[in-house]
């Protein structure tokens, strides 16, 4: 299994990095990585690591076809736009953040068959421990809808305010 996971990781890393704000709609589901090169003080080490080439993602995620998470009949690669939709959702989150600039982000992705999606995502996270996956929780969150708000605002939304729906949550007092 390690060789298969490594193959998926290598394939993602070989993909051209596209400015996050320029990702167009395309068909497929799969795995993606986001990279940061900006000047936010919290990410100085990450920016330094990515100064010459993009070697350390800030976030890794996956997008499965509709129905895929629950084992239902899933849409085919040719009919789902799950991956581009998810990446573009992330672009919207970055754009709404008051202290981030979309121009400082790049994305790589790999369209794969459903069976490889979870393997690819977990292998990338294990390999890189991206800060928005492993340290600063909440970037990948969706608006939970009414009646489902429990807990406090995510650490990500506390450090990077701007997502309107995150303001529904009580503020955190443990993030400085």
Predicted regions and their residues:
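Boundary/linker segments flanking structured domains
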Residues: 1-58, 62-176
């Amino acid at each position: 299994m390690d060789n298969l996971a490594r193959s998926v990781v290598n394939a993602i890393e070989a993909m051209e990095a596209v400015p996050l704000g320029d990702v167009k709609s395309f068909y497929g589901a799969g795995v993606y990585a986001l990279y940061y090169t900006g000047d936010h003080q919290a990410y100085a080490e990450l920016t330094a690591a990515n100064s010459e080439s993009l070697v350390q993602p800030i976030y890794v995620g996956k997008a499965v076809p509709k129905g895929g998470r629950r084992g239902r009949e899933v849409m085919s690669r040719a009919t789902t736009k799950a991956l581009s939709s998810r990446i573009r959702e992330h672009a919207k989150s970055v754009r709404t953040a008051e202290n981030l600039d979309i121009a400082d982000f790049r994305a790589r992705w790999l369209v794969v068959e459903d069976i490889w999606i979870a393997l690819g995502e977990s292998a990338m996270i294990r390999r890189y421990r991206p800060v928005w996956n492993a340290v600063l929780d909440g970037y990948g969150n969706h608006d939970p809808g009414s009646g489902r708000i429990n807990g406090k605002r995510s650490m990500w939304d506390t450090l990077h305010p701007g997502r309107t729906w995150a303001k529904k949550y009580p503020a955190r007092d443990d993030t400085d």
